[in-house]
A protein has these predicted regions:
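Oxidoreductase cofactor-interface core, primarily capturing Rossmann-like NAD(P)-dependent enzymes
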Residues: 54-172, 179
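NAD(P)H-binding glycine-rich loop region in Rossmannoid oxidoreductase-like domains
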Residues: 1-39, 50-55, 154
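Short alpha-helix in the Rossmann-fold core of NAD(P)-dependent oxidoreductases
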Residues: 22-29, 45, 65, 139
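Mid/C-terminal beta-alpha module of Rossmann-like enzyme folds, strongest
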Residues: 147-214, 228-239
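A short helix->loop->beta-strand "cap" motif at the edges of active sites that frequently abuts
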Residues: 38-43, 75-77
Length: 239
């Protein structure tokens, strides 16, 4: 059947380049939905994000994802919204930017550092105590698994009008993620507790520069974590 799958998302905004979440995520999906209606294409899958919400104090990324969901829900389309947690993996093998590669490049290899010394990787914490540093978790899921679910959902009429959350089989903390990436790339790291409000303030000044590892939006979402249980979903589709 004819269908539209809207995957466009913008992890980090650069307004001076015209790259904003409102433009590419919200307005883009809204426009494509209207085009689909005009062309008589009824089936529409929207890739949203786990944690999408209208909170004005939240990230612009999650706000835009929420607005996209509302636009699709208000359409006449046979829609399904899919909300994955953090994705990893490059299925085409073309070394395009992806979660783990970007962490390795922008955090573990941002500045020259002797390989024989443990690299001080930031482990963010909120509040006054550093004992919870880096414990926020993600249900990371491979992009190939998400693609497989999209294919299954496309022909599953029971998912029409539904919102589906997608996450990996286990929760992985920030500290575990960084240590795993370092191990896979032959590096040695130690997790250095870093006050979130300090890093967040610095990002407010520097996130306009592409070389800076993360913007305030990304930090807001990271510190909240992104966790769900999709065991039954994977079981249903035999993935």
């Amino acid at each position: 059947c004819d269908a539209v799958i809207y995957l466009i998302a913008l992890i980090r905004e650069f307004p001076k380049k015209g790259l904003t979440n409102e433009k590419l995520q919200f307005r883009g999906s809204e426009k494509v939905a209207k085009i689909a209606e005009n062309l008589g294409i009824n089936r529409f899958l929207l890739m949203s994000a786990l944690g999408a919400n209208p909170n004005p104090n939240g990230s612009k990324y999650m706000q835009a994802k929420h607005l996209s969901e509302q636009a699709i829900k208000n359409s006449k389309l046979k829609w399904t919204i899919l909300r994955p947690s953090s994705l990893f993996g490059d299925p085409r093998g073309e070394d395009r930017p992806e979660f783990c590669m970007m962490l390795d490049k922008l955090m573990l290899n941002l500045v020259p550092y002797p390989k024989f010394l443990p690299f001080p990787a930031p482990s963010f914490f909120t509040g006054a105590s550093p004992f919870n540093a880096g414990q926020y978790a993600l249900s990371m899921v491979h992009v190939k698994d998400v693609a497989s679910i999209f294919i299954k959902v496309l022909s599953d009429d029971e998912t029409i009008g539904k919102t589906i959350e997608i996450g990996g089989e286990r929760k992985v903390s920030w500290n575990e993620i960084i240590k795993s990436i370092a191990s896979a790339t032959g590096q040695n790291v130690f997790m250095l507790p870093a006050p979130f409000f300090v890093i967040f303030s610095i990002a407010g000044f520097l996130d306009r520069f592409e070389w800076f590892p993360a913007g305030q939006d990304q930090l807001k979402d990271l510190i909240k974590g992104s966790v769900c249980n999709s065991h039954e979903l994977f079981k249903k589709y035999e993935i």
